[in-house]
Regions:
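Universal eukaryotic N-terminal targeting presequences
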Residues: 1-2
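Non-heme Fe(II)/2-oxoglutarate
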Residues: 5-129, 148, 246-249
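Acidic-enriched, low-complexity/disordered segments with a strong bias for Aspartate over Glutamate
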Residues: 15, 20, 36-39, 88, ...
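Compositionally biased, intrinsically disordered low-complexity regions
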Residues: 30, 66-69, 78, 114, ...
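Intrinsically disordered, low-complexity peptide-like regions
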Residues: 72, 86, 141, 152, ...
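Catalytic core of non-heme Fe(II) oxygenases with the double-stranded beta-helix
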Residues: 125-244
């Protein structure tokens, strides 16, 4: 991974008193773009495992080992939870998360305290040291988008999101990730506001942004667009946790049952 990176503003009129990248990232005013975050071999491993799992699930569906879902909808999106659906990629997924934490420590140390409630020196150990990390439901994951696939505007509601492009640009048309200004989040959900920023970075690029940022996966017109995603916060210790917070935070967009996503994805491949 090269040390070069850039800051892409969501809010163009950044306050001069808080113009450092770490503060802007934590406040949801910008997205950090890290090229060459994930190399070709790592991408190939994730993609091979994801496509094999999709094919295996299709065989189960055809053979009757897995019953049809109660509802059918052509979402064009399949979400594969790495620990459960891609266990052979578990170590690689952890490696990418550690890499993101090390990047923040090295390049944006102030973001650790603001976004994850820890000092810069603690960042590299967050994944392994108690109490560990808490993920958005179903993550870390590999998302596969086929024609018509998209992810509606939502917020992840976690401390930090790491989104890594796995597909080369010539493998799909359409797509990209859209971001809205904080003031436009309600309008974005109603489809009444244009995004302030749309990014379609090359394969291997990571996007880092905060949990309150309204964003969406734009509609794929053809081909397959694949992403690795991990949205996480520092897990609260038992002494810090409240009874009402025993369940994980849920992203704002209603999530389909896994079976619904799978059936729609398989329909799109046929």
């Amino acid at each position: 991974m090269r040390s070069t990176w850039s800051e892409e503003p969501i809010v163009v009129e950044l306050d001069a008193s808080s113009s450092d990248a770490a503060t802007n990232l934590a406040a949801g005013r910008s997205v950090i773009v890290v090229p060459d975050f994930c190399d070709a071999a790592e991408r190939a491993t994730l993609l091979s495992s994801a496509f094999a799992e999709a094919a295996r699930s299709e065989e189960e569906l055809v053979s009757g080992e897995r019953g049809p879902s109660a509802a059918q909808s052509n979402t064009g999106r399949l979400r594969l939870h790495v620990p459960e659906r891609l266990p052979d990629c578990g170590l690689l997924g952890d490696q990418l998360i550690r890499r993101a934490l090390a990047f923040v420590q090295r390049e944006l140390p102030g973001a650790g305290e603001q976004m994850l409630g820890c000092s810069a020196t603690e960042l590299p150990e967050l994944l392994d040291a108690a109490p560990g990390l808490e993920y958005s439901p179903g993550e870390p994951a590999v998302n596969i988008y086929t024609a018509t696939g998209e992810f509606k505007p939502h917020e992840d509601k976690m401390g930090l999101t790491v989104l890594v492009t796995l597909s080369d640009g010539d493998e799909f048309s359409g797509g990209g990730t859209a971001f809205w200004r904080p003031s436009d989040f309600n309008s974005a959900r109603r489809g009444r506001a244009e995004p302030a920023l749309v990014l379609t970075p090359p394969a291997g690029t990571a996007l880092l942004f905060g949990g309150e940022v309204t964003h969406a996966g734009r509609r794929v017109e053809s081909g397959k667009r694949c992403m690795f995603v991990a949205s996480f916060s520092r897990r609260k210790s038992p002494a810090q946790a409240h009874p009402a917070s025993s369940s994980s935070a849920v992203a704002s967009e209603p999530r389909l049952e896994d079976g619904d996503d799978l059936d729609a994805f398989l329909d799109a491949l046929r």
